[in-house]
Swiss-Prot record:
Residues 33-217 form the EngB-type G domain. It comes from Rhizobium meliloti (strain 1021) (Ensifer meliloti). It comes from the Bacteria. This is Probable GTP-binding protein EngB. HAMAP family: GTPase_EngB (MF_00321). Keywords: Cell cycle, Cell division, GTP-binding, Magnesium, Metal-binding, Nucleotide-binding, Septation. The lineage of its organism: Bacteria, Pseudomonadati, Pseudomonadota, Alphaproteobacteria, Hyphomicrobiales. Pfam families: MMR_HSR1. Belongs to the TRAFAC class TrmE-Era-EngA-EngB-Septin-like GTPase superfamily. EngB GTPase family. GO terms for cellular component: cytosol. GTP binds at residues 41-48, 68-72, 95-98, 162-165, 196-198. One of its GO terms (molecular function) is GTP binding.
Amino acid sequence: MSATNKQNAASVFGRPWIFIRGVPSMKFLPPEGPTEIAFAGRSNVGKSSLINALVGHKGLARTSNTPGRTQELNYFVPDGYSGEAGDLPPMALVDMPGYGYAQAPKEQVDAWTKLVFDYLRGRSTLKRVYVLIDARHGIKKNDEDVLALLDKAAVSYQIVLTKTDKIKAAGVPRLVAETLEKIKKRPAAFPEVLSTSSEKGEGIEDLRAAIELAVTR
């Protein structure tokens, strides 16, 4: 990623960001407008914390130690745009409900799953999905199911390892290489794996630049 790319990303993510809408079902989705970048992952993988780190606002996306807390598609955009034609924000970040939380009531899990899958399959303004993988656990069966769905729907996605501060630093490059090997034959996977720590701020600048590049391509 070029210096210009990183400067553009810093400009976008350096603005104040705001929460605009929680979407409990597809009928409540906002009108299609700005490019959407979504974050998917197992419950408690750190989606909300990563979004907060990206925009430099610890309290923007609500975080919780309780798995399954995010139950809607939560939309965030940079402030200062009217949202009208000709004055749309450059992108919207979408915090998706976590999957794989077995302790939630079945009806709730089914509703979350339907919302996530319907959104991934049917949103034309969705440019890329960042699938977050806990560095301590690697890719699980639930993750593979989501990757297969994204492959089938031809939705571009990129793997982001989270919580890398929780493993030995020397093990991060090896984990990145192993993860890349697992996804290299998947048709919709972007051929680069990013590593991040929201707590330490590691990898955040690279992720911002990757998002900016995905939006502007």
